[in-house]
Structure formats: C-alpha cells, structure tokens
Amino acid sequence: DMLDCRTAPTPYRSGLVYDRIVPDGDTLSPAAQTAIVTQYQSLIGALNWMAVSTRPDLTVSVTLLAQYNTTATPAHLLGAKYVLRYLSGSLDHGIAFTSQSASSYLSTTYSWPKDDPLLTTYTDANWGPQDASKPHPGDLITLTECCSLLGSISTRTGGPLAWHVIREPRVSRSTCESEIKSADEGTKVTQFIRHLLADLHMPEITLPTTLWNDNKGAVDWTHNCANKKMRHLNIRNMAVRDAHRCSEILIAHLPGALNVADLFTKEHKDDAHFLRLRNIIVPPRGKFPTPGGC
C-alpha cells in the first residue's frame, strides 16, 4: 500500500544504480519470483504511461527499470516503488504551454530557451556507466551498462512536445561520439514534428529548427570541422550533417548547465540540479503561465 507513503525528492534512490543491482532470482522460489515479476510489470506499465504522456521527469528512471521486466528482483521492485514515492510528492507538476512567450516558466526561470515560441530541440548524452565509475580488477562489466543514454526534448510555446531516452545499441568510443548519436536521434524527432507543422501550414518551417547541444566537438563535427579521430562514424550519423546542410536544423552549442536535455541522460544524484531541470519542464501548478496554461 503506497497511499500514505513518505515522499521522495527525486525518482532516484541514493546508492541504488539500477545497472549494478545483482540478480538474486536463484535465491527465490519460482512462485515468489513470478509474483515479483508480475507486480513489477504492472507497476512499470503504469509508470511508463505517465512517462510518455505527461511526466517527462520519469523517463530515465522508467526506461532503466523497464530493462528488467522479465528478470526483476526485490531490489528492482523497491526502485520502482521509490518512483511512486517521488510521484506522491510532485502531484501538482505538469506540462504547460502559453501563447505569450515572455510569461512561460521556461523564459521566466532565466533567459532560456533562445527561441521559446518556435520549435526548439535540446539533445544530450551520458557517456559510459551511469555511476561514472572505473572498473576494478575482477569486476564484471556488462556491455549494456557501458552503452550511453541518449536523450532529447523538443519544445514549443513554453512546453515540451516530445521527449525520449534510449540506450545506444553499441558502445561509443568518446563523449563526442555519443553526443553525435544523441543529435541524430533528436534530429529524427525534429524532422517528424516539422512534417506535422508543415501539414498545419505553420510559417516557422521555412526556417531551420535550432538544435542545441552542449558538446563543442559534436557541434563542430556537424559543421564539417572533424578530425581523424571521428572517421569511424558511419553513414547513419552523417544524417545529422545532411539535415544541417538542407537547412532543416541548425545545430548550436550551449553550456551544459543550461541544457535541459541533461534530465534525460542519467540517474541524477544532485537533487538540486534535478529539481531545477524538472521545474523548467514540468512546472508546479502555481507556476503555470496564465493565460494559456493548461
């Protein structure tokens, strides 16, 4: 029963990195393991509905937890219930849009984003393991946990239109490479939204959509300023350059502290940083813009 649970400041349990939870299915009876998996799948399904619909701040935690839908352990179940504790303390947060750019919570927080009324995309990546740890002799390191998390969010009129978190299928050799892959994923979403805006005859599609990224090397690579260390990138990643060349997107650099896509790339241990980004994307009800809030 989680109706009267204690609230939590973030969806991430301190000291519990999902990728490092040791499976203990061998110590449970088949019936007990089945019961845990069934309860876990039901809970993750409900959380996933919220993460893809109205609560972008849940996306990373739900994405990581969903990897263990068929092999869940009691520790994974505790992690999922911790997300419920976070939700219990943030019920008044939600997505808000406004027709008046200057009154949006995005703009009033600080001078961000740069093109609030227009479609704007932010991308980021977290290179390597979630806890940024270096393996010790004898440690078992899986390929999965070494694959970076790629995140992006597309905003317009002060609120998020689309967001996603994916785990790259292959390990990146550098931070720059993982950021380029993130920009590629963000470009695909941006192009899709631009098609919808074209169907609605929105005038902004005559201009390139700004795509912000906090990695200078990735931005320079998009502008054809590459070096021999990046020659191994494949044709798939070249699609970012092609979209830039065709003026569909304009990739620009912004400081990492201002990149709201950072919310979608890691299990945050800095509560203050997480809450600042959370309040920008899904502001509390008292901060909803008026008129135009929803």
Regions found by a protein language model. Name each.
Residues 32-60, 126-142, 171-195:
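Conserved pre-motif C helix in the palm subdomain of viral-like polymerases
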Residues 85-125, 204:
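Structured nucleic-acid-interacting core domains from mobile-element enzymes and related host factors
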Residues 61, 138-141, 145, 261-266:
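Short, conserved catalytic/metal-binding micro-motifs enriched in Asp/Glu and His
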Residues 1-99, 103, 255:
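C-terminal reverse transcriptase regions that engage the nucleic-acid substrate
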Residues 47, 113, 118-176:
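RNase H-like nuclease fold core
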Residues 50-61, 149-158, 189-211:
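Active-site palm subdomain of RNA-directed nucleic acid polymerases
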Residues 68, 118, 166-294:
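RNase H-like nuclease module associated with reverse transcription
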Residues 18, 47, 55, 83, ...:
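Mobile genetic element proteins and their domesticated derivatives, centered on retroelements
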